[in-house]
């Protein structure tokens, strides 16, 4: 794997983000009995984990991770906008937006 110049490789942030998303779905199920929250959390957490794994193998392979975090940023951003509640929509929207920004910056900073 080539050095990208960052202190922590991008995929480690991706694995943490995937764990956050999946655990959010599990917590939503445990606290409120929400099966859709569990299903969405596990689906998007798994996709984010797959994207992070792909990043660990090839730092240029960002598309699954970018699509997953971008989709979650949009969905949870709209939920946060309409509800005004930081938990869980605002937290996931913010984390997703940060991941989109981090991937975007890494795409523009890498050698072509």
Swiss-Prot record:
Topology in the lipid bilayer: Multi-pass membrane protein
Transmembrane stretches, start-end: 7-27, 32-52, 62-82, 88-108
Keywords: Heme biosynthesis, Membrane, Mitochondrion, Transmembrane, Transmembrane helix
Pfam families according to UniProt: Tmemb_14
GO cellular component: mitochondrial inner membrane; mitochondrial membrane; mitochondrion
Localization per Swiss-Prot or TrEMBL: Mitochondrion membrane
Major subcellular location class: mitochondrion
GO biological process, one term: regulation of heme biosynthetic process
The family this protein is said to belong to: Belongs to the TMEM14 family.
PANTHER family registered for this protein in UniProt: TRANSMEMBRANE PROTEIN 14, 15, TRANSMEMBRANE PROTEIN 14C-RELATED
Cited function: Required for normal heme biosynthesis.
UniProt name for this protein: Transmembrane protein 14C
Organism of this sequence: Homo sapiens
């Amino acid at each position: 794997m080539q050095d990208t110049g960052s202190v922590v490789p991008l995929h480690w942030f991706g694995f943490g983000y995937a764990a956050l998303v999946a655990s959010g779905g599990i917590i939503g199920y445990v606290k409120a009995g929400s099966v859709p929250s569990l299903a969405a959390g596990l689906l998007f957490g798994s996709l984010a984990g797959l994207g992070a794994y792909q990043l660990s193998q090839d730092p240029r392979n960002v598309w699954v991770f970018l699509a997953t975090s971008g989709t979650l940023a949009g969905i949870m951003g709209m939920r946060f906008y309409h509800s005004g509640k930081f938990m869980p929509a605002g937290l996931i929207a913010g984390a997703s937006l940060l991941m989109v920004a981090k991937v975007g910056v890494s795409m523009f900073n890498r050698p072509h």
